[in-house]
Amino acid sequence: MKKVGTGQKRNRSIFRFSTLAFAIHAVSMGGLVVLPMQQAYAQTAGVKSYNIPAGRLANVLNQFAEQSGTSIAMDAQQLQGLHSLGLKGNFAVEQGFEQLLKSTEFNAVKVGQGYTLSKKSTPRVISSKVQATSLPPSSAVIEEDASVRLTPIVVYGKEDRDTEGYNKVYDANRSSVYAGKDYVERFKGTNPADVLQGMVGVYSGDARNSGALDPSVRGVQGVGRVPLTIDGTEQSIAVWRGYNGVNNRNYIDPNLIAGIEVIKGPSLERNTTTSVGGAVVVKTLEADDIVRPGKSFGAELKVEGSTNSIDPSLPDMSKVGQNYDDTTPWIDMNGSKYDPDIYKKNRTRSDNSHFSGDDLAGRLAIATKQDKFDLLAVYAVRERGNYFSGTHGAGYYKRATPDSSLDFIPYFAYAYQPGDEVPNTSSHMESWLLKGTYRPTDDQTLKLTYRDTKNIFGEIMPSRIVWGITPDLGVPQWPLSNIHSKAYSLEYKFKPENNRWIDFYANIWQTDTESQTYTRGGWPTTIDFRDNTIINTAISHSDNTRKGITVSNKTRLLDQLDLTLGGSFLKEKLTSDDVYGEFGPSYSLYQALPRAGRREEKTFDFNFNYRPVSWLSFDAGMRYRSYWAIDDFLNKSLQSEIDPSLNPLFTKKSRLKEYTFEYQTMPESYTSTQQRLINVLKQRYATKNPEWDGQLDTVPASESTLYNMIWSQKNTLSWKADANGQLSLADNPLNQLNASGQKYVVTGGNFMSVVDQVPVESADKVKDSGWAPQLGASIHLTPNSRIYARYAEEYRLPSLFESTVGFSAMLQYQAIKPEHAFNYEVGYVYDMRDWFSTARNADIKLAYYYNKTKNVIERDQNLIFTNMDEQKLSGLELQSRFDNGGFFTDLSVAYNLKNEVCDTNSAINKMILGGTVQTEQGLEFREPYQRCVDDGFPNGYLVTMATPELSFHGLLGARFFDEKLELGARATFYKAYESPLRKNNDASVNKGYYLNVPLAWDDTWIFDAYARYQVDDYNTVEFVGSNLSNQFYIDPLTRSAMAAPGRTMKISWTTKF
């Protein structure tokens, strides 16, 4: 059958009817199958205004079905070569079909809730009472002069998955972005995180050094803030990055993706897990993606190969456990030893063979669609070596030599030479996807899904790159990490026809993730000098299991009022078989504590949708969340199963008691000895400085002996904290000192902290809960334009990562509160198809958002989890698209207006750590008090989550030869970024990007292009070029200074049979 409409047409869907199913519908409708449409139907259908341009008859009928809100089944082959003059004016549905088909041999016949296209026949009606404008009475006998043979058909009108996803961006009263199956497969790139490129306002943290996605939406990122679900299942693991913070990893195989929707901000959307930042909703392949229209069985084979790859030169880990003296001598540099099997010169651009065969992928899918059931089986594999970086635009990253700066970025290109291999970037991914759908009745659906993915990939702890030696030894190549993830889900839908009370959905699911990753903090090979044994202190093992239930029901209370009820339950368990302290205290300090704990979360929500008139709608609802969590590792530690001397920080809580500050004054009187010595020193100073006025308080500090004798009375100021270790600006002791009028000097100028170590006596269960409302309204200003506004609150309850002791942060004294987000958004949407007579899509959307999150969970400057007062984010987003079949484009721009973090306690601590300075007004802090700072405070996580101030994504293309050939190009721009901590030369920040200071990047343009050709109904070939300008760059939000892939060419072949 001819493929109809390869472009993305608005409001069009393709789903299949088997011949048997269609025949059953036809028989059930009796004589309606062969009779022309009559006015009786027109009386029940609304009249609408249409302006459909001339074109191929199949396309015109499709557009009419879309705009009228119905569906029509047709055999596209029967319409080949037929054209239509279009439709303009006011018509009911039946009148419109009659007008479009009046000069053809076809008519449209109503079948159930839709229509089917049938050849016209001349019925003989044996009754003198039948009128031309009415249906025949039941006594009439109808005979056909000719019968119509039913052929495989395609039903148009109802949207398919991808069309619905793209349209929802402009139809929903909220912000989102969508990528369909073709787009994901075309631009899936080198790393899994590449599937998010091109989505406005959406990024992934540490894209090149994680093998996973760490979603960021409108600057909101982190564990639990932007949940990622795959077919309704959730899997997320927090991973330590040493001095460079934490990753929120979501492992996914791009070869299984059928569509990605990113929802921006909290939402009460049905059967969707969102949080304070929104959600990433991933759907995997279905039988509809594989079985050809009108067929019952189908298979798809996809193979592809890419350039710019080379097999990694992996170290031999069999030496672990051997005596160092029995191995190849290690490299001795600057008093340290380096394993030559790990530290080796990286391959150069001359080793980059364009057709090496080191990046190959394939996918085989087999499916069947029957009346009662569907089955799908998919196997996908991709093996890719290390990639090579680009060569152009490296000047920004080559502004200093390694021995002249502790700032990584200015000499980044010395470590990663442009065009050279980037170690630790390889991947071997293998997946299975099995789905079975059973339809016991027309009202019920039961779907069972199983997904299994093995991912063996390269990564390195960012702080182990050892920047000072990489130009000489090369970037170390570590062994590969290993992830095995499984997911199971059972979905049930029940939607009785003509029942306004029941539209029920339930999903029971589980994910299991086994991790063996090089994220523990040590080294893959190091020497245990107690016995000279080579040991591996970098590998970490963990198991994460999540079990969940999601249920919802939608009820139509009135014709204008819907109520949706929903609820969910999540149970999570994290375990590890790592033995903390197995190599003694000298190594345990470099290793992460093995987190272990349990957590449960429950939600309940309701949402009303009210449509009082056709141009106005309202949404109002609330969500309740509750949780509890318990730290199993801490509990085990407190039972004396782990020696606390290895790391006492996890058995004690730190609480700031006070800051003390010393200053000196003149004593009320000097001792006789002091007075004699001062007199002698005064005389000497006066002799050398005849202009001296003789006053002791004007003796400069350079006369240190006399100066110290004069100011010999030591005094102490104290800035006391409250019972929870929090400081108040009103208690600033310098204000009191300056107001006293007392003469004093300061020789040190630094405040000293006094911290109480409070023993942890028990690992108690922590819990919390909260209700959050959401409101929205939309107004259609014209039939083609509307405005909307929404207000959404949301709670994010502390994650298991924030509820357990382990890597990256110490135990907090005060219990962590839930984050509470307040999100505001207004938007304007305009459908411009009236401007373009041949447009399938022509939309523009402008949105403004302002998000404030109170009690945002963060790591403070003392590396302790705490609640910041608030974070404020705001920005503008523009999205647009156009498609007329021959030409299409999709353009989007994001401009961030504000990213501000506010916290009184952090601001005071930052001010104190900056030191003091003497001024004419007295003693003052060198840095002024600043409650709100851009991006975040030093040593925290938020400061590394800043996104580009300005970004642009553009896609444009054209179709030729009856849309068999498609050519397209994509451009992506990120504005340069440098953290305010760097720009302001913050004295409290350690040089060299220590303790989570974000990396900078230059203005970045990335250009991609593709050519897709449909050889015949069964075969498609596609060429894709990524980073065509061969740019040398790093990705935004990266925590690991690793160059991105250079120019890469991919060819793929897909066949369906």
From Swiss-Prot:
Question: Per its record, how is this protein called by name?
Answer: Hemophilin receptor
Q: What is the protein's known function?
A: Part of a high affinity heme acquisition system. Functions as a gateway for heme entry into the bacterial cell, enabling growth on hemoprotein sources. Can acquire heme directly from hemoprotein reservoirs, however, HphA likely enhances the efficiency of this process by delivering heme to HphR. Is essential for virulence, bacterial dissemination and growth in the blood.
Q: Which family does it belong to?
A: Belongs to the TonB-dependent receptor family.
Record-annotated TBDR plug domain positions: 168-285
Q: Any phenotype upon disruption?
A: In a mouse pulmonary infection model, the mutant exhibits reduced bacterial lung burden, and is virtually undetectable in the spleen and blood. In a systemic challenge, the mutant is avirulent.
Native species of this protein? Acinetobacter baumannii
| Location of the TBDR beta-barrel domain | 296-1057
Where is the protein found, in the record's own terms?
Cell outer membrane
Q: Where is the signal peptide?
A: none
